[in-house]
Amino acid sequence: MSRLLESEQESESGSENLVSSGSIALSKHEEQKRELGVENRLEQYSRRLSQLALVDTNESSDSSEKEEVFVQGSLRSQQSLKASIQSSSHGHTGAPQKVMIKFQSIGSITSITPSVCQISTNKPFSVIISFLQRKLKMENIHCYINNSFAPVPSQNVGDLWNQFKVNDELIVSYCGSVAFG
């Protein structure tokens, strides 16, 4: 019976060793997972920093060269994006270069002839105001779009036309005194 007890004790101690070695193996595996997780997070963090062009000066020269190449590539992509935005804003997307403006008088102010004129889309609305001042030989002229609101003089005529055109014409009403509240 002593042999049986000794073998049981050996098997129990062996199983404890297996369990302890298994837990060591599991803990090593968990540590590796944690290290990989930390490494992955650090890599993601460094990628984000390089996208923001915040490069750490303490890194090795190889990684800094790679980041500089990445930053240069991102700058090129930003420049191409700006160029495409500028080309689309200059009317290369099919929008007309000049738009039709229809003038309507309000009240006792004289009407101008012709009542329809063309203007470039990139001009500010102040150009229309100065045109009316010259044409009517008046200093104070109040302009309204579609008889509803007075645009800011710095507003782009092309933007106003895109948003408020009626039958491909921007209707500009004008008068010598304030017409609407």
Swiss-Prot record:
GO CC, one annotated term: cytosol
Cross-link (Glycyl lysine isopeptide (Gly-Lys) (interchain with K-144 in ATG5)), chain numbering: 181
Entry keywords, A to Z: Autophagy, Isopeptide bond, Membrane, Protein transport, Transport, Ubl conjugation pathway
An annotated Gene Ontology molecular function: enzyme activator activity
Entry membrane topology: Peripheral membrane protein
Stored InterPro entries: Atg12, Ubiquitin-like_domsf
Signal peptide (from-to): none
Record carries keyword RNA-binding: no
Superkingdom per UniProt: Eukaryota
UniProt subcellular location: Preautophagosomal structure membrane
GO terms (BP aspect): autophagosome assembly; autophagosome maturation; autophagy of mitochondrion; cytoplasm to vacuole targeting by the Cvt pathway; glycophagy; piecemeal microautophagy of the nucleus
Segments of this protein annotated with the region Disordered: 1-40
Function of the molecule: Ubiquitin-like protein involved in cytoplasm to vacuole transport (Cvt), autophagy vesicles formation, mitophagy, and nucleophagy. Conjugation with ATG5 through a ubiquitin-like conjugating system involving also ATG7 as an E1-like activating enzyme and ATG10 as an E2-like conjugating enzyme, is essential for its function. The ATG12-ATG5 conjugate functions as an E3-like enzyme which is required for lipidation of ATG8 and ATG8 association to the vesicle membranes.
Similarity-based family: Belongs to the ATG12 family.
UniProt subunit comment: Forms a conjugate with ATG5.
Protein name (record): Ubiquitin-like protein ATG12
